[in-house]
Amino acid sequence: MTTSAQLFEQACRHIPGGVNSPVRAFKGMERAPVFVERAQGAYLYDVEGQRYIDYVGSWGPLITGHADPDVLGAVRSRLDDGLSFGTPTAIETRMAELICEIMPSIDMVRMVNSGTEATMSAIRLARGHTGRDKIVKFEGNYHGHSDSLLVKAGSGALTHGEPSSPGVPASLAEHTVTLPYNDLDAVRACFAELGDEIAGIIVEPVAGNMNCIPPQPDFLKGLREICDVHGSVLIFDEVMTGFRVALGGAQAHFGVTPDLTCLGKIVGGGMPVGAFGGTREIMEQLSPLGPIYQAGTLAGNPLAMAAGIALLEKIRQPGFHDALAERVATLCDGLEARAREAGVDLITQRAGGMFGVFFTAQQRVDNFAQATACNADTFRRFFLGMLEHGVYLAPSPFEAGFMSSAHTPDDIQATLDAAEQVLATLENA
């Protein structure tokens, strides 16, 4: 038994499923999860001392790689001053200014402790602002695990075959209308029937929790137009895409302006954090200015603010995101070429610094139904083979991959060399 397997067995005695987030359990992969000891740059090092080229990056935050010296230095510089105060600080104001500067759709922003808190708070704000109850979301889009949004969700809920969860009251779920992603006609039909009851639409502008599914042309623009006509709030969940698809997020990349934006991951530089922001008109309805309540004991934590500011300042340098997208293109084009040579049905999809690998004969994957129709068993064998060759991909066919600026051309070439060997074993899949 490996050390990781022993540690997993031990963890299962006191942690449900042995993990603190379900996708980490490697469920369906027929092996224990990798227990990581440390990480540096583009690499993970497990408890056995094995090194892996990492394309998970702590599920997205580590866009400059693990243990970035500038980010760690910023945290160290604050550490001796205290961990948390429960008071306003200058550093949280600097973070707010920086976010508003980078994302022009955000006039005001409030920090929270997770992406789930960000989306939950944005939904409450949209409902309070409009005086309506219903929220539209999309199949396979994951917006955290709050009750209102854990309906036909992606991410771990999709991997585990739980498109909704026991414990979510029907009285809450009935206010969530779930539609097919990338289907504007379905959205129009929904609003034709229920438009005066719909507080808002929440959407992943690039769906990253059913692998990586970019929006079809005009999908996001169409959502904006529908919300404008019906007086509903358009919420972009940019927890994953914010500062990664482009510096200004997917909204900058696709040229569509939401009313509210949810952020997380990169904004904390690897520390637990989230944020939501938007127009002054809507955000000023939050307590203590307005009647809509939201709070958090550790929100705006100074260490998280220091880490996030250091990272944002680093990635806003000219050319950073272009170089990241070039790395992704090299990897994805190389994977497709090697799959063709091996006779394996494989396509990739990408958006900025994120990408997806689909084992399918389809030319494109646009929605939940098409994502779940891909060959999950072939993915499982590919994942395990790549792991044996020292490449760490997301342990689920429904999670996006993430590139960092720490990945070198040699890392990408080593990944493609490993893929060539593994794909050769899948030829008759």
From Swiss-Prot:
- N6-(pyridoxal phosphate)lysine PTM positions: K265
Q: Which InterPro entries match?
A: 4pyrrol_synth_GluAld_NH2Trfase, Aminotrans_3, Aminotrans_3_PPA_site, PyrdxlP-dep_Trfase, PyrdxlP-dep_Trfase_major, PyrdxlP-dep_Trfase_small
Its required cofactor(s), as named, are: pyridoxal 5'-phosphate
What are the alphabetically sorted keywords of the record? Cytoplasm, Isomerase, Porphyrin biosynthesis, Pyridoxal phosphate
Q: Which PROSITE patterns match?
A: AA_TRANSFER_CLASS_3
- GO CC term (a single one): cytoplasm
Q: Does the keyword Transmembrane apply?
A: no
Its annotated pathway reads:
Porphyrin-containing compound metabolism; protoporphyrin-IX biosynthesis; 5-aminolevulinate from L-glutamyl-tRNA(Glu): step 2/2
- Return the Pfam families for the record: Aminotran_3
Q: Which reaction does it catalyse?
A: (S)-4-amino-5-oxopentanoate = 5-aminolevulinate
On assembly, the entry states: Homodimer.
Give the protein name, as stated in the record: Glutamate-1-semialdehyde 2,1-aminomutase
